[in-house]
């Protein structure tokens, strides 16, 4: 329990932004990747990543790396963050970037150097129309470098739900078709 960064905590902050919902994964050389949200209102959060060295110094600059920069994620949503087993991280979330009062699930894979493997603002799990895709969970197959994303899918009124999933290539291409796979079909909750 010895404090390795001194008696006082290291504060990562901005004079113009609020940071919330932090998550940390182990990276290379004793370093860590910090993922957090940057809320700018109730439905205007973004996601950012920082890398800290063993002394708590920011390695990717004060602004870090933007994971999701469209600002259409609810500020109360906590992104899912998992290590990739290769000193990087996987981040999943849902947002309403289409502007149609529906949310869709997205995933991003960031390397230990801060490079994004997937397109800017993440890869979308499903392009199925007139559906919400909430509460994504992410997993990574280190041997194949494939990413798996699973979510709860609902129709617009949210009276029915099911579990759907998608497999992504190392560069973020959908491998299970544009609508993903159905694991539990839509049905009314019991």
Locations of regions flagged by a protein language model:
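Extracellular, repeat-based ectodomains that mediate carbohydrate processing or recognition
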Residues: 1-190
């Amino acid at each position: 329990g010895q404090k390795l960064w001194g008696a006082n905590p290291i504060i990562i902050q901005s004079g113009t932004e609020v940071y919330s919902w932090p998550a940390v994964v182990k990276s290379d050389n004793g370093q860590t990747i910090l993922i957090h949200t940057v809320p700018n209102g109730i439905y205007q959060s973004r996601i950012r990543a920082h890398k800290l060295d063993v002394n708590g110094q920011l390695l990717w600059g004060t602004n870090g790396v933007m994971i999701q920069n469209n600002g259409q994620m609810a500020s109360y949503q906590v992104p899912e963050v998992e290590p990739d087993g290769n000193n990087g991280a996987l981040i999943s979330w849902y947002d309403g970037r289409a502007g149609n009062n529906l949310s869709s699930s997205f995933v991003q894979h960031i390397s230990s150097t801060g490079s994004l493997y997937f397109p800017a603002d993440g890869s979308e799990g499903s392009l199925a129309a007139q559906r919400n895709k909430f509460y994504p969970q992410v997993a990574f197959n280190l041997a194949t470098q494939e990413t798996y994303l699973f979510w709860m899918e609902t129709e617009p009124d949210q009276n029915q739900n099911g579990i759907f999933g998608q497999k992504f290539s190392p560069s973020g291409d959908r491998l299970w078709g544009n609508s993903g796979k159905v694991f539990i079909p839509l049905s009314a909750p019991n």
